[in-house]
């Protein structure tokens, strides 16, 4: 069940609450077991959604889930204050350092990465034309909620807090979360959740990940949050304890880091978590995490050049590694590197690359049922653009070409220079009154590739 918290101490929260109630036909009941200012009194319910109102400012309310009837997710309707003009935003709550605005020092509410991803998308769908949609780093309280939670906010000043279109957009986005799970599905013993580390308060890099990949982001420690942690923590051990809490409160085993922080990377890895790149996140999108792990073990890590082919998304069958001759891959790449990549990507689950993923080298991973010919034959067609003939004999490819032999030309005392170059490109030249035919200096070359 989705629980919605509306605070009487926040005008924007009340405004969003008004639109929440107007958008649906709610059933009302009276809860006499709690004071009216603590979520009792009139309770609004529809299907799997329950709305309650509280007198206190929501960032100061602790254990608010206890007021609701067994919620799975809580959303705080709220204002956003800042110098960001028209903005709809969503974020998780907690404190990496001293709790200056609710909650406890170095503590975090349980994040809801999956629902947060969904609400960012919903805010984008419903946003008025003049409003930006964004996400923020983790900040303020509460830190003890009882279930996964987040704030959904309208900002950034009084004109926006009173804007009915903005309040309605936030209300619609919140209602879209009915039956939305707090977390991404579990796979391979983990989830597609990231702890965000570094960057600015409004976290554009992590927002890009949320929008463009199938990963979700839990708590985010912005640069200022890391400074607050360093100032508050008395030791590396205390710092690591807070980081571990942030991972646990995000249900995350992975961190995505903004900037180069070797000491922090080492600390995170010592806790048993993995720091990944945005390349990893993009490449692993749509690919079963168990398959990602297996192929990284078998070939190489994504950050060292593993790339996933067109067959990878959703693939859960057996696979095999084809280790084609390096000379074959190199020669095909020399003929047409784009055609090589397109061919390998189309035929493969994964393949190895070098130079930051720009140069395909192999090996190649294909479904176990793949016939060798299915991979090799398209490469032969590319080779034919250079060679006069390419034939397959048993387990061998034989490529033949007739080409200019510079050593042969030198033995005939052809001087280096422009005329030498013309001969190399197949043009006749005149030397000492004699016309020299380039065919005199051509030889058949044979390339053999053992499959």
From Swiss-Prot:
Binds 2 Zn(2+) ions per subunit. Transmembrane segments: none annotated. The keyword Hydrolase applies. It holds the Pfam family tRNA_deacylase. It catalyses: a D-aminoacyl-tRNA + H2O = a tRNA + a D-alpha-amino acid + H(+); glycyl-tRNA(Ala) + H2O = tRNA(Ala) + glycine + H(+). Its EC number is 3.1.1.96. Signal peptide: none annotated. Keywords: Hydrolase, Metal-binding, Zinc. Gene3D superfamilies: AF0625-like (3.40.630.50). Monomer. NCBIfam families: PRK14866.1-1. This is D-aminoacyl-tRNA deacylase. The gene is dtdA.
């Amino acid at each position: 069940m989705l629980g919605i918290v509306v605070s009487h101490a926040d005008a924007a929260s009340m405004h969003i609450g008004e639109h929440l109630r107007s958008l649906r036909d709610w059933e009302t009941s009276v809860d006499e077991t709690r004071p009216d200012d603590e979520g009792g009194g009139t309770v609004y319910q529809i299907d799997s959604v329950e709305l309650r109102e509280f007198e206190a400012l929501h960032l100061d309310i602790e254990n608010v889930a206890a007021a609701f009837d067994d919620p799975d997710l809580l959303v705080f309707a709220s204002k956003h204050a800042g110098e960001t003009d028209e903005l709809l935003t969503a974020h998780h709550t907690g404190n990496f350092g001293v709790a200056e605005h609710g909650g406890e020092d170095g503590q975090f509410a349980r994040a809801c990465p999956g629902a947060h991803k969904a609400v960012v998308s919903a805010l984008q769908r419903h946003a008025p034309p003049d409003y930006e949609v964004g996400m923020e780093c983790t900040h303020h309280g509460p830190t003890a909620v009882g279930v996964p939670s987040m704030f959904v906010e309208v900002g950034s000043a009084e004109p926006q807090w009173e804007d009915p279109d903005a309040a309605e957009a936030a209300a619609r986005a919140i209602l879209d979360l009915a039956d939305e799970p707090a977390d991404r599905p579990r796979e391979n013993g983990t989830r597609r959740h990231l702890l965000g580390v570094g960057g600015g308060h409004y976290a554009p890099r992590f927002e890009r990940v949320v929008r463009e990949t199938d990963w979700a982001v839990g708590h985010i420690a912005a640069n200022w949050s890391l400074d607050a942690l360093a100032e508050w923590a008395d030791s590396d051990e205390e710092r690591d304890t807070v980081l571990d809490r942030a991972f646990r409160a995000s249900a995350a085993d992975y961190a995505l880091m903004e900037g180069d922080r070797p000491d922090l990377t080492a600390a995170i890895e010592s806790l048993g978590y993995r720091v990944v790149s945005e390349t990893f996140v993009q490449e692993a999108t749509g690919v079963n995490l168990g398959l990602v792990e297996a192929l990284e073990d078998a070939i190489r890590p994504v950050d060292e050049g593993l790339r996933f082919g067109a067959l990878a998304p959703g693939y859960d069958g057996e696979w095999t590694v084809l280790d084609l001759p390096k000379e074959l891959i190199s020669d095909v790449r020399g003929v047409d590197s784009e055609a090589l990549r397109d061919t390998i990507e189309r035929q493969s689950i994964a393949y190895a690359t070098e130079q930051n993923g720009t140069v395909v080298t192999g090996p190649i991973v294909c479904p176990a049922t793949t016939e060798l010919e299915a991979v090799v034959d398209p490469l032969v067609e590319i080779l034919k653009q250079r060679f006069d003939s390419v034939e397959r004999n048993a387990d061998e490819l034989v490529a033949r070409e007739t080409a200019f032999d510079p050593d042969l030309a030198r033995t005939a005392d052809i001087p280096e220079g422009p005329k030498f170059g013309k001969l190399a490109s197949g043009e006749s030249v005149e030397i000492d009154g004699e016309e020299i035919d380039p065919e005199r200096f051509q030889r058949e070359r044979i390339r053999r590739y053992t499959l």
